[in-house]
UniProtKB/Swiss-Prot annotation:
It is an enzyme of class 2 (transferase). It comes from the Archaea. One of its GO terms (biological process) is RNA processing. The lineage of its organism: Archaea, Methanobacteriati, Methanobacteriota, Methanomada group, Methanococci. This is Polyribonucleotide 5'-hydroxyl-kinase MJ1315.
Length: 361
């Protein structure tokens, strides 16, 4: 059940002939070599990545795979960009364990271009002296701002080869500026490529979340034991007691936590009275504590890579602790330097409870 749900793409050599032509070029090109795969949703990028990696392994090359498709992640954990070094043939990318991951914090890249580009670049740089060939799998976001994301990734990563999987020249406008300096292969989307509905994609993601968080434990981590990032709540300095009293009196709130940074207050509160309040959110931003329930957080090491993910079960503002459910070991917990808040809420059964806007916390 898990394998059937989680794995969309499998290793097969029953693919169009033009894939073998691209493989031949890769085989004969000077190493090390960086390859980016581009294509829309359900265009066969992951199937192609699986094929290329296996064939190149068979030829004796050291291969690295950077999985940056945060919406339909093959190499767990979800909501991250992952680097893996497969050493032997594999059936699908789900079988491969990540070597390093970078936390994005969402399955929707639209508001996270910085994380998408930074993570992909850092992992490619890390792999460059450890592999002959780096294969970068990408999201299916190729129109609108998605085209900008692909352009910026190409500019930052500087691949040697781009393989574009197209139906009707939809990638030509993105890639035309690069054609004179990067080898670009335009391949047709395989006519038998399987399509997945939005609901099927959601079910696949649910199985991946559930698989990742099985065998998890609860850890309580103090505010002062780590850096807490990815939220404005802990930026700047904690508000003073007289400031807290004034705000509570003025707006009839119970303030659980408050901070101020660069002239702006951020308050976590509960309403004591149901009443209209005229508040300039550029000066005073307020958050209900429930917004943090079941929030995905990244557990970050000293090198800014993601050790693993956690589900933020509760924030105890009174005792200044975070209650986090995570499958990582107690030994790895000791290596956490930052807990970075994401923007997707998920329960331990894999159910996605909703995405948050980047500025909402």
């Amino acid at each position: 059940m898990v394998d059937n749900m989680i794995s969309k793409a499998y290793y097969t050599t029953e693919i169009p002939e033009d894939r073998f032509e691209a493989l031949s070029c890769i085989k004969d090109s000077q190493k090390p070599l960086k390859i980016i795969l581009l294509g829309g949703v359900d265009s066969g990028k992951t199937t192609l990545a699986t094929f290329l990696a296996n064939e190149l392994l068979n030829l004796g090359f050291k291969v690295a795979i950077v999985d940056s498709d945060v919406g339909q992640k093959s190499i767990l954990p979800p909501a991250t960009i992952s680097l893996a070094f497969p050493e032997t043939n594999f059936n699908n990318l789900y079988e491969i364990k990540p070597y390093k991951s970078y936390f994005v914090g969402s399955t929707a890249p639209i508001q996270f271009f910085g994380e998408m580009i930074t993570g992909t670049k850092l992992l490619c740089d890390y792999a460059e002296d450890k592999a002959d060939i780096i294969i970068v799998d990408t999201t299916g976001l190729i129109s609108g701002s998605g085209a900008d994301l692909k352009r910026m990734k190409i500019e930052m990563i500087k691949p040697d080869i781009i393989i574009a999987l197209e139906k009707r020249n939809e990638l030509k406008s993105i890639l035309k500026p690069f054609e004179n300096k990067i080898r670009v292969f335009y391949l047709k989307v395989y006519e038998n490529a399987k399509s997945f509905s939005r609901e099927e994609r959601k079910e696949i993601r649910a199985e991946k979340w559930k698989e990742y968080f099985k065998n998890s434990k609860i850890y309580n981590i103090g505010f002062n034991d780590v850096v807490i990032g990815g939220t404005k709540v802990f930026q700047g300095e904690k508000i003073l007691e007289d400031e807290k009293y004034l705000l509570e009196s003025l707006f009839k709130w119970k303030i659980l936590y408050g901070s101020k940074c660069d002239g702006r207050y951020t308050i976590v509160k509960r309403d004591l009275v149901n009443m209209p309040r005229q508040i300039d959110k550029n000066i005073l931003y307020y958050i209900e504590p429930e917004r943090f329930n079941n929030l995905i957080v990244g557990l970050i090491d000293e090198d800014s890579f993601c050790i693993g993910l956690g589900i933020l079960k509760t924030i105890d503002f009174e005792n200044e602790t975070l209650e986090i459910l995570t499958p990582i070991s107690e030994e790895d917990i000791k290596n956490i330097r930052e807990i970075r808040f994401g923007r997707i809420r998920v329960d331990e059964n894999g159910e996605e409870l909703g995405l948050l806007d980047r500025d909402s916390i």
